[in-house]
C-alpha cells in the first residue's frame, strides 16, 4: 500500500520550514512552529511584527492541499456522476479517505491521527468539495463533529477505544435532529430512562447524515424531560445494538451520495459507560460541535462554489458567439468579477473563523458569518455558472447543474441562514 502524504507528515518524513525570520534574541515556542495559527505566520521587519495574509500557509498546509486535490481528482471525480445518480457513496471512496489519513486530521498521533490543525480540516473539506460536496460532508462530520466530541469530552478509556477506529475504519454519525426539533434543536422527544447500570433509549431521529455507512452513532436523548434541555445527554450507540433501526435513505435534491436516514430506538439498552461526557451536558456539547461544524460547512460551500467556477470559466473563454468569446462581453465580465469577489470574501471569512478557533479566541459570530455568507455565495455562483454556460449548463452532461443542486443545502443544515443571522445579530446586540 502506498504511503499517504498525511502519513509522511505524521512520521516526520517531511522537513519543516516555517515562515518566520527572527533575531537570535527572539525565541519562538516549539508549539508555534507546528501551528497554522496567525501567530505562526509572521515575520520581523525593522523590529516590527508583520502578520501574513490569511491565505499564507505552512509547507504542511500546502502539501496537504496538493495531496487531497490529487486524491479527489483521481479517486473521486470518476465516480461522482454515478454516486449522484444512484444516491449512494462508493465504499472505495470511504476507504480511500481513511487510507489517506483524512478522517483523523486533528486527532493526536497516539491514537493514529494526523495531529494537524483545525485549518487543515477546513482546507481538506474545501478541496474535496471542489469535486464532490457529498464526500466533503462525510469528511467534515467525522473531523469537526465526531472526532472533536470524543477529543473534548470523552474519557481516556473512550478515546483509547474509539478514536483509533474512527481514524482508520469506523464512520460516525451525529444524531440530534428530530421531526419536531429542527431549528429548535433542543425540543427533543427521544428520551433515555435509567435502569440499573443501563439507560434505555426510546424515540426517533430524522435527517441523520452518514447513517447508512456509520457504525457508531452519537445520540442525543433526554434523561430528565421535565428539566428541558438540561436533561439532554449524549450516548454512544453501536450500529448492531438491539432495538436500533436505520430507515431508508431520503431521496434528496442534492448531496445525494451522502446518506440521510431516519433512525428509530425501541428499548435500546446501553451501559452507563456509553455516556459521552457528563449527564445533562449534551446540549452544551451539541452547541459547541455545531459552532465549529458551521465553519466546516462554510468550507464545503466555498469549495463547491469554487469548483463550479473553475469548471465554468474555461468554457466561457472558449465559447464563441457573434464572432468573439462570450467572456469578452463586458456584461459577462462584470458578472464574473462580481462572483469572483464574493468567492474571495467567503474564503477570507472562512479562513479567519478557522484561525480564531485555533487561537482559542471567540469565534461563534465569525463562524455564523462564514457559514451564512459562503452558503449564499455558493447559491449565487452555481446559478450564475449555469446561466453563463447556457443550455449545456442545464444538462447532466456537465457538472454545474449538480453543483447547483448541492449548494442549496448550505442554507438549511447546521443552522439555516436565518438562524445564522439571528446569531450574528445577538452578538452585535451584546457588543453595543
UniProtKB/Swiss-Prot annotation:
Quote the transit peptide annotation as a residue range.
Answer: 1-33
Catalytic residues in the record: 414 (proton acceptor)
Q: Where are the transmembrane segments?
A: none
User: What PROSITE patterns does the database record attribute to this sequence?
Assistant: ACYL_COA_DH_1, ACYL_COA_DH_2
Tissue specificity field: Ubiquitously expressed.
Q: Which residues bind FAD?
A: 174-183, 207-209, 319, 330, 387-391, 416-418
List, alphabetically, the GO terms of the cellular component aspect.
mitochondrial matrix; mitochondrion
Q: How is its activity regulated?
A: Inhibited by N-ethylmaleimide, hydroxymercuribenzoate, methyl mercury iodide and heavy metals such as Hg2+, Cu2+, and Ag2+.
On whether Transmembrane helix is a keyword of this UniProt record, the answer is no
Residues with the modification Phosphoserine, per the entry, are 183
The cofactor(s) it depends on are: FAD
Q: Which UniProt keywords apply?
A: Acetylation, FAD, Fatty acid metabolism, Flavoprotein, Lipid metabolism, Mitochondrion, Oxidoreductase, Phosphoprotein, Transit peptide
One GO process term, biological-process aspect: acyl-CoA metabolic process
- Where N6-succinyllysine occurs along the chain? 70, 278, 284
Q: Name one GO molecular function term.
A: short-chain 2-methyl fatty acyl-CoA dehydrogenase activity
Residues recorded as bearing N6-acetyllysine in the entry: 70, 284, 426
Catalyzes what? Answer: 2-methylbutanoyl-CoA + oxidized [electron-transfer flavoprotein] + H(+) = (2E)-2-methylbut-2-enoyl-CoA + reduced [electron-transfer flavoprotein]; (2S)-2-methylbutanoyl-CoA + oxidized [electron-transfer flavoprotein] + H(+) = (2E)-2-methylbut-2-enoyl-CoA + reduced [electron-transfer flavoprotein]; (2R)-2-methylbutanoyl-CoA + oxidized [electron-transfer flavoprotein] + H(+) = ethylacryloyl-CoA + reduced [electron-transfer flavoprotein]; butanoyl-CoA + oxidized [electron-transfer flavoprotein] + H(+) = (2E)-butenoyl-CoA + reduced [electron-transfer flavoprotein]
| Pathway participation | Lipid metabolism; mitochondrial fatty acid beta-oxidation; Amino-acid degradation; L-isoleucine degradation
Q: Where in the cell is it found?
A: Mitochondrion matrix
The keyword tRNA processing is assigned to this record: no
Among InterPro entries, the record links this protein to: Acyl-CoA_DH_CS, Acyl-CoA_Oxase/DH_mid-dom, Acyl-CoA_Oxase/DH_mid-dom_sf, AcylCo_DH-like_C, AcylCo_DH/oxidase_C, AcylCoA_DH/ox_N, AcylCoA_DH/ox_N_sf, AcylCoA_DH/oxidase_NM_dom_sf
| Enzyme Commission number(s) of this protein | 1.3.8.5
Q: Would you identify the family this protein belongs to, as annotated?
A: Belongs to the acyl-CoA dehydrogenase family.
Role description? Among the different mitochondrial acyl-CoA dehydrogenases, acts specifically on short and branched chain acyl-CoA derivatives such as (S)-2-methylbutyryl-CoA as well as short straight chain acyl-CoAs such as butyryl-CoA. Plays an important role in the metabolism of L-isoleucine by catalyzing the dehydrogenation of 2-methylbutyryl-CoA, one of the steps of the L-isoleucine catabolic pathway.
Task: Spell out the subunit comment.
Answer: Homotetramer.
Under which name does UniProt file this protein? Short/branched chain specific acyl-CoA dehydrogenase, mitochondrial
Q: Which organism is it from?
A: Rattus norvegicus (Rat)
The gene is: Acadsb
